[in-house]
Amino acid sequence: MYPGEALYIVSGSVPNLKSTPLIDEWFGLLYRDGQFIQRLSMEEVVQKAGLRSARIPNTNCITNQSIVAASSLLHDVVTQAKTYLTERYQQYQAEMNPKLDAEVDKLIELQEKHKEYYQTTLFEHERQLQEQERRVDKLFDDFTNWVKETLTIQNNPYIRIVSVLMGVSE
C-alpha cells in the first residue's frame, strides 16, 4: 500500500425477517488522501495489503495524525458500505422475488388440491369437511408465512468496521 492510502475492512450483513443474515459479506473500501477510490473483494484486499507475505505490515508506523485522519472517514466508510449493501439487497430481491412468488403459487396450488381431496371424501360430513378445511388453511398459512419470512430480507444492513490498514512511508 502507498502512503496516504487507507483500506477499511468491512463486514456487512442483511437479515431476513427472522433476523438471520442472508447476505453476509466481507469487503474492503479503499481511500487515497481521504477520497473514496473503490470497493475491493476480500481477495483483492489480501493482495493489495500484502497479507500473504511473511512480513507484517505497518508495525509501529502509524502516527496519531494518521489515526485521526482514518477516524474522520468513518462516516463516509459507513455510507459507502450501505450503498454497496443496498446494491446487494436489490440484486437479492431481483433474484429471489420471482422464486418466492413461484414457491407461494405452488403452495396455493397444493392447498387447493388438499381442499379438493377433503371435499370429495367428506362431502357427506359437513362438520368434518369444514374442520379439515380450517386445518389445511392454517397449515398452509403458517407454512406460507414461514417461507416469506425466511426468504424476504430487510434493507437494514448490519455494518461492522473490522480493521483499517494504512500505507506508510518506510
Label each residue range with its predicted role.
Residues 1-170:
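Charged, non-catalytic accessory extensions
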